[in-house]
Amino acid sequence: MTSTLDVSKVLGLLDQVLAERKASGDPEASYVAQLHHKGLNKILEKVGEEATETILAAKDAERSGNTDLLVCETADLLFHAMVMLSHLGSNTDAVMAELARRFDLSGLEEKASRK
């Protein structure tokens, strides 16, 4: 099993690669650079597609008890969400900071604070 430190390192390295591909990647040679080149609407289309595939994989996992496909689809969803964040000038550090802020709140308290 991967430790928390390893997960943070993976996310940080991926954030770095995404930023590099956005800044100077060749759309002919890099999928991420190609997504950035095509713009936000294409990136959002991919996020939506991956979200749908994740939902379908979750339903399959519930029936079969096998979460392998669900894990793969969730990784795809997270990856494309990270591309979206990168495209808009943010990264997973901001998301992790928000999750950390919410950690000491109950779900209902956190939801009420957004109103």
From Swiss-Prot:
It catalyses: 1-(5-phospho-beta-D-ribosyl)-ATP + H2O = 1-(5-phospho-beta-D-ribosyl)-5'-AMP + diphosphate + H(+). Disulfide bonds: none annotated. Pathway: Amino-acid biosynthesis; L-histidine biosynthesis; L-histidine from 5-phospho-alpha-D-ribose 1-diphosphate: step 2/9. It is found in: Cytoplasm. Its EC number is 3.6.1.31. GO terms for molecular function: ATP binding; phosphoribosyl-ATP diphosphatase activity. One of its GO terms (cellular component) is cytoplasm. CDD domains: NTP-PPase_HisIE_like (cd11534). It holds the Pfam family PRA-PH. InterPro entries: HisE, PRib-ATP_PPHydrolase-like. Keywords: Amino-acid biosynthesis, ATP-binding, Cytoplasm, Histidine biosynthesis, Hydrolase, Nucleotide-binding. It is an enzyme of class 3 (hydrolase). GO terms for biological process: L-histidine biosynthetic process. PANTHER family: HISTIDINE BIOSYNTHESIS BIFUNCTIONAL PROTEIN, HISTIDINE BIOSYNTHESIS BIFUNCTIONAL PROTEIN HISIE. Belongs to the PRA-PH family. This is Phosphoribosyl-ATP pyrophosphatase. It comes from Saccharophagus degradans (strain 2-40 / ATCC 43961 / DSM 17024).
